[in-house]
Amino acid sequence: SIRDNKVAYASFKEGKLLKYEVTNDINKYNFKTGTIVSFIPDSKIFKEGIDLDYTALKKQIQELAYLSPGLKFTLKYKDKEEETIQSNNGILDYIKDLNNNKNTLTSVFYTENIEDRIGVKIALQYNDTYIDTYKLYTNSIPNSGGTHLTGFRTALTTSINDYAREKNLLKEKDSNITGEELKEGLTLVLSFIMPDPVFSGQTKDVLSSSEARTIVQRLVSKDLKTWLEGNPKDAKA
């Protein structure tokens, strides 16, 4: 790893640190900052060797690129041609990719906020399908659900209904639009960053930190209201 003209090198074997050193020898590298990670499977555990799934590996790196705009990844695997993966627009590029070849109904709503060391990035867009697509992350780790999603759903449902009532799109006798109805055709990317997150579920991929719901709900409600007011055509869609 290179930073501040210093090279830090660490090697591990069977979970134990073998070597750690910091030097000034940066001339043999073709970059000024960054990290290289290499590994060899432990033959005591993987006795038959391993064969990495290149497609899955590339997909994971592409997601990391979306979550870290501007960061450049280089992927080289066996005899495949070296690839550079980078996203300049972050999750805005992600939404565009997810809705590729779909008929979109709205522009993209995007918000980004940082509060007390907790960060939230959200991009959403509706298409004309009946399928909802959620891509959720906490500290760049994929999640299948959690309190951040709960907070988002509450904010979305409340904001849409408040706007519809205010603009007379829903009459007094009309029932509120439900969260289930708002799921149809929704494409969402939600990146949540916080220190010491808590996870639950069998595979520990569900965020259960209670503060995530409160923060996401408050921030999304505020910015979504502004977006709806400024984009009436999208709001009606």
Name every feature range the model reports, one short phrase each.
Residues 3, 10-29, 52-60, 135-154, ...:
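Extended active-site and interfacial segments that coordinate phosphate-rich ligands
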Residues 178-237:
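Extended, well-ordered alpha-helical scaffold/bundle regions in very large, multi-domain proteins
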Residues 7, 22, 36-37, 108, ...:
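Extended aliphatic helical segments
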Residues 43-52, 170, 200, 226-230:
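Short, polar/flexible loop-turn hinges at active-site or ligand-entry regions and domain interfaces
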Residues 5, 166-170, 230, 234:
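Short, polar/charged, Gly/Pro-enriched helix-capping and turn/loop motifs at alpha-helix termini
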Residues 1-97:
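GHKL-type ATPase core
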Residues 55, 62-65, 70-202:
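GHKL/Histidine-kinase-like ATPase module
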